[in-house]
């Protein structure tokens, strides 16, 4: 994220005041958005859920999340109430509701609000409400303030506390990439009991009310998420009070941006402090990037030096071998010349040492007649 874009975002958020006068902090957005007309959603019928955790498995595989400590067929994890985290974007919990002789199971994940509190609270606009109904997150814009975690009424966004260098927010995306390919969300596709129904939100609202009307006594006469917090893409049916399955029934119907704008705006603050704090956050981020770049450059430098040293060693070894080979060749030639000279000398000496043949002249020998 470059400095120009960062400061531009600060300007659009109304946080670049340079006069340090007493004022009131404002949320990044105070407007309302009724949602996309033909957006999609999911209806979760908790009366059908059997707590098999197949949805958790599908979510893990589709999003390539880390392997869990307990296998997905290990149902002992249901003995404790869990919440989503950076490595688990959806979880199923078991509840023992009063008056029932069997447990109730409910899947938990991002509800993909029509007017997301996370998007409203995020001053760098790292969250996006998409036309397909999903709410997605762009980690390249995030500065790690975690306002989204505070703003979310459903406690969904999770921070990667275990990541030391580049922690990000993690949450369900409603399988946004799969929707773009015309596929169902992974959890919906794998559910063996059709406890999850995917479709256009307006159709799901109708389906939910039809089930309530056609099955008297089976459901609470309410579709959770139809109106809560201005409405959510993920909605619920239940046979017991929603509070019995850990859901907040006191949220009201006012949209989340109105709540977050009021909450942030109620905090008295010196306006001039915001640029300092946020520029400081930017500086920390840039310093981290600079250190990483320096470490990378140093690693490359060391690698080049090591390669050069290795090449020098190889060259020295080759030259030494060449000198040794040359010396050996000279020694061989000298020895050869000496051997040839010795051989020639010995041949000449042998020739000189041979006796001369007697002369053939017989005149004047005694006893011969004149």
Curated annotation (Swiss-Prot):
[4Fe-4S] cluster 1 binds at residues 49, 52, 55, 191. Residues 40-70, 101-132, 133-162 form the 4Fe-4S ferredoxin-type domain. This is Protein DVU_0535. Keywords: 4Fe-4S, Cell membrane, Electron transport, Iron, Iron-sulfur, Membrane, Metal-binding, Repeat, Transmembrane, Transmembrane helix, Transport. It holds the Pfam family Fer4_11. [4Fe-4S] cluster 3 binds at residues 110, 113, 118, 152. GO terms for cellular component: plasma membrane. It is found in: Cell membrane. InterPro entries: 4Fe4S_Fe-S-bd, 4Fe4S_Fe_S_CS, FDH_Electron_Transfer_Unit, HmcB, TAT_signal. It is a single-pass membrane protein. The keyword Transcription regulation does not apply. Residues 285-370 are periplasmic. Residues 1-258 are cytoplasmic. [4Fe-4S] cluster 4 binds at residues 122, 142, 145, 148. Residues 345-370 are annotated as: Disordered. It comes from Nitratidesulfovibrio vulgaris (strain ATCC 29579 / DSM 644 / CCUG 34227 / NCIMB 8303 / VKM B-1760 / Hildenborough). The chain crosses the membrane at residues 259-284. Residues 345-355 have a biased composition (Basic and acidic residues). GO terms for molecular function: 4 iron, 4 sulfur cluster binding; metal ion binding. The keyword ATP-binding does not apply. It comes from the Bacteria. [4Fe-4S] cluster 2 binds at residues 59, 172, 175, 187. Disulfide bonds: none annotated. HMWC (high-molecular-weight cytochrome c precursor), ORF2, ORF3, ORF4, ORF5, ORF6 in the HMC operon form a transmembrane protein complex that allows electron flow from the periplasmic hydrogenase to the cytoplasmic enzymes that catalyze reduction of sulfates. ORF2 is a transmembrane redox protein.
